[in-house]
A protein has these predicted regions:
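UBC/E2-like fold recognition across ubiquitin and ubiquitin-like conjugation systems
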Residues: 1-59, 69-194
Length: 194
């Protein structure tokens, strides 16, 4: 078995143990070592602005794909083609994510799949915002984020509030309910991933 297949199997085993009340995922490809995942986040994120006020939407599907060069190269992480897409300083206009782990990717070692999913969730729910190296320079969004979400301490930027103005909420655990459908929205409280 190749190093790639070993790592993909390990990533899949990690995902089978990972749980979140606001995330659904499915593996695509080889049943023991899948190289693609669809991960749906049932969180509220900003999709635009109306007179300086954020417009939000809940429910985003993210595709995580491992190339033939994995684990030497990081996986491709992007939103699927279904719109609306969230706008965020750390999501490129073409839907690719600029993850914190990108700067720390060590060829052959990488970042575990559950940590990647955690980072994506924190970005979508505006719990993680890096405006210093913004992938998306949308001026209205950056201005709103600076005024409402972040404060700076020395060289660091910290999130002071998730999305406008109250924290994001988690659904109660109820396997019979599919959160994020058009007619249901989760009750509000801070999201914990994993």
């Amino acid at each position: 078995m190749s190093v790639r297949e070993d790592r993909l199997m390990a990533e899949y085993e990690t995902m089978k143990k990972w749980r979140s009340r606001v995330v659904e995922w499915r593996a695509i490809g080889n049943s023991k070592s899948p190289d693609k995942y669809e991960v749906t986040y049932h969180v509220k994120s900003i999709i635009g602005f109306d007179n300086g006020r954020p417009l939000t939407h809940t429910g985003f599907k993210v595709i995580i794909e491992f190339s033939g060069d994995y684990p030497r190269v990081k996986p491709d992480v992007h939103l699927d083609s279904q719109r609306p897409w969230p706008i965020h300083p750390n999501i490129w206009p073409d839907g690719r994510f600029c993850l914190e782990g990108d700067q720390h990717w060590i060829p052959g070692v990488g970042v575990p799949m559950d940590a990647i999913c955690q980072m994506i969730g924190e970005i979508l729910s505006y719990q993680e915002v890096n405006i210093r190296s913004a992938a998306n320079g949308n001026a209205a969004m950056i201005d709103w984020v600076k005024k409402n979400l972040v404060f700076e301490t020395g060289s660091n930027t910290k999130v002071k509030n998730p999305i406008d103005p109250s924290p994001i909420r988690l659904p109660d655990i109820d396997d019979s309910v599919k959160w994020g459908t058009d007619d249901q929205e989760p009750p509000q409280q801070r999201i914990v991933f994993g």
